[in-house]
UniProtKB/Swiss-Prot annotation:
Classification via InterPro entries: KH_1_KHDC4/BBP-like, KH_dom_type_1_sf, KHDC4_KH-I_first, KHDC4_KH-I_second, PRP5/DDX46/KHDC4_KH, RIK/BLOM7
Name by which UniProt lists this protein: KH homology domain-containing protein 4
Free-text note regarding domains: The C-terminal part is necessary for the interaction with the PRP19C/Prp19 complex/NTC/Nineteen complex. The KH domains mediate RNA-binding.
Composition-biased stretches (Low complexity): 506-515
Gene: KHDC4
Keyword RNA-binding carried by entry: yes
Source lineage: Eukaryota, Metazoa, Chordata, Craniata, Vertebrata
Annotated S-S bridges: none
Length: 619
């Protein structure tokens, strides 16, 4: 029976006839129908008998393993589709929905979270970096979400004309959970941010499972700078603000080193500003020593301080410090110029200091005599030689001239008592007694307070001495005096001015000698062009003055006037000696002022009387 049964089975197998052993066939058919739609794993042979027999033999595998395989296959397909490497056909989707396992697959696909990040307007380097497969694989590995490129690059005009099915370039991100998608999107945003700006681009987007556009804001910012990798250093260079402050001492005195004053010792001033503010500060322009790389020489601009800083606030702080530095330098230069201006007159007009020290000089004259003391003084007095420099020195003495004139008339009573004594005594004693004993106490304050005004009042003493000497000695002395140009004469005035003032005060009692003495003083004040002629006239005048009586005063005045014409005095208006005669000499003052007016071409003696002090000496 067994053999017959075996033969029947073989016959049934060959002839397609079925036996009772073929009943389990429908079970494998169910498995086939469920396992066939697995994508990428099709089974050959749809449902013929041979296949059913083979599957019935392998039916030992449990049905749960098939379900697990179907689930794994669905998951793999979902990952491939998320990466864009597998695009499911519509018929496959229909099969998935038609088959028994379709609802489970659809459920897993609905669980994927999708997000979109637009990269159409980011800089070119960012766009190239994000569309590279290597970058997208790195993002997928770090985040667990799939990243793919969608759409195409569009310009602004193309975006305005875009059709409904066309979209600008963007990144498609999808993952199993929202956290994975957020992680991928944040990484994309970080890459874009590093390429565009340092600041944050905005809050992270929220996903509700639908398509979300994450990145729109940086579009206008990115248009400013096309280069992304070089952006941070290039941005810092572009944003450097700079300014310049001109020193303003282009015409400074050469001895004032402007560059050194501004930079400080070892450039310490500018380095301090750099340390305080972080700015770049250095000198440029003429005289700065800064060589321009383009021209190989200093800039043609005046010297200035160049300031540059990345931020306007730092530039303002550095500029303020530089302004303070320049103010200090300008103040120092002003003090320097004031010192120069005060030192230069002292060098050119050293005689005021020497004149102020004259009160000690009379001690030389009494001891050595007039002639011996005379050569000692000329060297310091040589700068006084220009006659036109004297008016510049006279003004300080003029305010004192009224004091001198008032004090001298008050001292007139004691002066006549001493005047005859000086005439009677021998020449050597007269040179000592009037200077040392009687007249120094009265005239000392006048000498100290008059730096230059004493010069006009001093001259007459040589004449007083000459009246006391013999006729020959004054001649030699006068010629010797006039041989020295002008400085020695002024020195003589300084040394013998005390007795001359007393003699001027005694003009009321001795008018004849006074007139000759005044003429002599005027002659020596402004030396005449021809010295020998003047010396002869002065000698004759002196002789007549010594031997004349008070009754011959008018005659002396006339002779003095004619001699004044011969002198040709340079205009020397406002001398203190003239004012002295106007107050001290009664008749002699009027005649002498007329003589001066003839020599000076003065308007009239009345105007001289009105104008006691010249206009440039008015206080």
């Amino acid at each position: 029976m067994s053999a017959g049964g075996g033969g029947q089975r073989d016959a049934g197998t060959a002839g397609g006839r079925r036996s009772k052993w073929d009943q389990p066939g429908p079970a494998p058919a169910f498995l086939l129908s469920g396992a066939a739609p697995l994508p990428g794993r099709p089974f050959p042979g749809g449902g013929d008998g041979g296949t059913a027999v083979g599957v019935s033999e392998s039916s030992a595998a449990p049905s749960g393993a098939l379900d697990a395989a179907a689930a794994v296959a669905a998951k793999i397909n979902a990952m491939l589709m998320a990466k864009g490497k597998l695009k499911p056909a519509p018929n496959t989707a229909d099969k998935l929905q038609a088959l028994g396992k379709g609802p489970a697959t659809n459920k897993s696909k609905d669980d994927l979270v999708v997000a979109e990040v637009e990269i159409n307007d980011v800089p070119l380097t960012c766009r190239n970096l994000l569309t590279r497969g290597q970058t997208q694989d790195e993002i997928s590995r770090l985040s667990g979400a799939a990243v793919s490129t969608r759409g195409r690059f569009m310009t602004a005009e193309e975006k305005a004309k875009v059709g409904p099915g066309d979209r600008p370039l963007y990144l498609h991100v999808q993952g199993q959970t929202r956290e994975l998608v957020d992680r991928a999107v944040n990484r994309i945003k970080e890459i874009i941010t590093n390429g565009v700006v340092k600041a944050a681009t905005g809050s992270s987007p929220t996903f509700n499972g639908a398509t979300v556009t994450v990145y729109h804001q940086p579009a206008p910012i990115t248009q400013m700078s096309p280069a992304v990798g070089q952006k941070p250093p290039f941005q810092s260079g572009m944003h450097y603000v700079q300014d310049k402050l001109f020193v303003g001492l282009e015409h400074a005195v050469p001895t004032f080193n402007v560059k050194e004053k501004v930079e400080g010792p070892g450039c310490s001033y500018l380095q301090h500003i750099q340390i305080e503010t972080g700015a770049k500060v250095f000198l440029r322009g003429k005289g700065s020593g800064c060589i321009e790389p383009a021209s190989g020489r200093e800039a043609f601009e005046p010297m200035y301080i160049y300031i540059s800083h990345p931020k306007p606030e730092g530039l303002a702080a550095a500029k303020k410090l530089c302004e303070n530095l320049l103010q200090t330098v300008h103040a120092e230069y002003s003090r320097f110029v004031n010192q120069i201006t005060t030192a230069v007159p002292l060098a050119g007009f050293a005689q005021p200091a020497a004149i102020n020290s004259v009160p000690s000089q009379p001690s030389y004259y009494p001891s050595n005599g007039y002639q011996s003391g005379y050569p000692v003084v000329p060297p310091p007095q040589q700068p006084v030689q220009p006659p036109y420099g004297v008016p510049g020195i006279v003004p300080p003495a003029v305010p004192m001239a009224p004091g001198v004139l008032t004090t001298l008339p008050t001292g007139v009573p004691p002066v006549p008592t001493q005047y005859p004594i000086s005439q009677v005594q021998p020449p050597a004693s007269t040179g000592q007694s009037p200077l040392s004993a009687p007249f120094l106490p009265a005239a000392a304050p006048v000498k100290t307070t008059l730096p230059a005004g004493t010069q006009p009042q001093v001259q007459p003493h040589p004449q007083g001495q000459k009246r006391r000497f013999t006729e020959e000695l004054p001649d030699e002395r006068e010629s010797g005096l006039l041989g020295y140009q002008h400085g020695p004469i002024h020195m003589t005035n300084l040394g013998t001015g005390f007795s001359s003032q007393s003699e001027i005060d005694g003009a009321g009692s001795k008018p004849a000698s006074s007139s000759g003495k005044e003429r002599e003083r005027d002659r020596q004040l402004m030396p005449p062009p021809a010295f020998p002629v003047t010396g002869m006239k002065s000698e004759s005048e002196e002789r007549n003055g010594v031997g004349s009586l008070p009754g011959s005063h008018d005659h002396q005045a006339k002779k003095m006037k004619t001699s004044e014409k011969g002198f040709g005095l340079v205009a020397y208006a406002g001398d203190s000696s003239d004012e002295e005669e106007e107050h001290g000499g009664h008749k002699n003052a009027s005649t002498f002022s007329q003589g001066w007016s003839l020599g000076y071409q003065y308007p009239s003696s009345q105007q001289r009387a009105k104008q006691q002090m010249p206009f440039w000496m008015a206080p």
